Amino acid sequence: MPAVIDKALDFIGAMDVSAPTPSSMNESTAKGIFKYLKELGVPASAADITARADQEGWNPGFTEKMVGWAKKMETGERSVIKNPEYFSTYMQEELKALV
């Protein structure tokens, strides 16, 4: 797994992964991460997300949401990021440094 994907999944793993449905803040952050990864040319795959989720014991509903959003961002399907400010400049810089 590329280091940038590993770091992105670290950010997501810091969320409340025990809840079946992410909070609106976590939803916006995750969607921002997946969109940015695509812009960097390193989209997150369902396999990478699922492997991390299984390893760390994420809630299956949470994992399903993450995989769905990653797929939408990768295919360019429309996806609304309600609060884009939650995906911080710090996160962007950390991810970009690993590409």
UniProtKB/Swiss-Prot annotation:
Gene3D superfamilies assigned: 1.20.1290.30
InterPro entries the record matches: DUF1889, YoaC-like_sf
One Pfam family named in its UniProt record: DUF1889
Name of the featured protein: Uncharacterized protein YoaC
Organism whose genome encodes this protein: Escherichia coli (strain K12)
Upper classification of the organism: Bacteria, Pseudomonadati, Pseudomonadota, Gammaproteobacteria, Enterobacterales
